[in-house]
Amino acid sequence: IGMVFQNPDHQILMPNCRSELLININQNISQNEINKKIEYVLDQVGMAGFEKRPVHTLSGGQKQRLTIACALISNRNFILLDEPTALLDQTSQLKVLKTIKNLTSDHKKPLSALWITHRYEELTYADAVAELKNGFLSSWQEPSKFQYN
C-alpha cells in the first residue's frame, strides 16, 4: 500500500526530491528507467524539473505533491491518501485529482486509490463515496447520488 499523509513533513525523510523518490522505487530496474519514472511522476504532480531541489526549499504544497509522487512511483496496487489536497492551491488540487483519476482509470496497470477528504467538490473524481458518521460506515454510493447532510 502506498501512503500519503495529510502533513508531508511526517513523511519526507531525504534531503532532495530525487533521493526521496529513490527510496520509494524498485531498484531492480536500469538507471535509464529510474530516470524516466522520476521525470514522469514529477510531471504528473506539476513538479517537472524539481528532482534536485532540496526539500527544505519546497513550499507545503510542493512537499505534499512530492509525497504523492512517491506513492505513485512505488508501483503499488493500492494508494491510501489522507486529505492529499489539503495544502494545495486550486490549480494543484485539480492536477493531483485528475492524475489520481487517470491512474485509477488506466486498465493496463490496476491501481485503486482511497482518499479521505472533507471537500465535497472532490467527490466528482471518485468512483464511489463512503461516508463515515461517528466512526461507522453510514453509506456507500455513487458520487452523483451523494447528498451532504
Question: Which sequence ranges carry the predicted segments?
Answer:
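Conserved ABC ATPase signature
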Residues: 54-58, 62
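Helix N-cap at the start of a conserved alpha-helix in ABC-type nucleotide-binding domains
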Residues: 90-92
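ABC ATPase C-loop
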Residues: 71-72
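Conserved ABC ATPase "signature" region
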Residues: 32-50
